[in-house]
Amino acid sequence: MLKIAVPNKGSLSERAMEILNEAGYAGRGDSKSLNVLDSANDVEFFYLRPKDIAIYVAGGQLDLGITGRDLAADSRADVHEVLSLGFGSSTFRYAAPAGQGWSIEKLEGKRIATSYPNLVRDDLAARGITAEVIRLDGAVEISIKLGVADAIADVVSTGRTLRQQGLEPFGESLCTSEAVIVGRRDEEITPAQRVLLSRIQGILHAQNYLMLDYNVDRDRLDEASAVTPGISGPTVSPLARENWVAVRAMVPLKSANATMDKLASIGAEAILASEIRIARI
């Protein structure tokens, strides 16, 4: 039986559980449940602190886990990314009071508050900077106002919380992050794990693509196919209308409108886009 770790709370939790549910797995009926047995799919899900997930996976107690790239890196657990999930995007930045001309070099000898001490220590060491790293488990932004730190290092999504506290990020980002599935390093994916990953990839593909159908003169088919190459080539079927064909292809959701405009410009007709619920590609 597969043992899979899922964030029990926080920004990654809700979306991770939605994807698993859409992929056909049992959900967490009670928000206080620590584990859910999905006997139909031969999987048990464990709801854990996001910061701890990579440690459990590296230790062999769990097969795979959903966590943040930054959290996995800060844990220093011996894991690797198996699949990026495309949500929970953020950057990890230094920040300090706005308008004071901070730079990374000015961190020398200063106090830096963070919930990611290992990431910060590694970055400072790589830059040859000596500073005091103060670990906090939350509300890092208020630490400067309370006199605990001179600067902070934290996850930045919109930057609104920083601005509310009169802070601004400075220097280049320490890392970029998003939700990922991690597995033990140097361990091959098993067939059972591959099924789960395939289901999740199918959901991600379905969310990021549309199915496009249209009719076009066969003489313009090469042009149309160049606009809609699909995943492994478009599906082309003859129409009763002489010298015309029906074409079907997957297109990225983000560029669907521009793609439809291009098709219309070369004479395509009856251009229709439909959602994809589940896919295996």
Swiss-Prot record:
Its main location: cytoplasm. Pfam families: HisG, HisG_C. It comes from the Bacteria. It is an enzyme of class 2 (transferase). Pathway: Amino-acid biosynthesis; L-histidine biosynthesis; L-histidine from 5-phospho-alpha-D-ribose 1-diphosphate: step 1/9. The keyword Cytoplasm applies. PROSITE patterns: ATP_P_PHORIBOSYLTR (PS01316). SUPFAM superfamilies: GlnB-like, Periplasmic binding protein-like II. One of its GO terms (biological process) is L-histidine biosynthetic process. It catalyses: 1-(5-phospho-beta-D-ribosyl)-ATP + diphosphate = 5-phospho-alpha-D-ribose 1-diphosphate + ATP. It is found in: Cytoplasm. Its cofactor is Mg(2+). InterPro entries: ATP-PRT_HisG_long (IPR020621), ATP_PRibTrfase_cat (IPR013820), ATP_PRibTrfase_CS (IPR018198), ATP_PRibTrfase_HisG (IPR001348), HisG_C (IPR013115), N-reg_PII-like_a/b (IPR011322), N-reg_PII/ATP_PRibTrfase_C (IPR015867). Keywords: Amino-acid biosynthesis, ATP-binding, Cytoplasm, Glycosyltransferase, Histidine biosynthesis, Magnesium, Metal-binding, Nucleotide-binding, Transferase. This is ATP phosphoribosyltransferase.
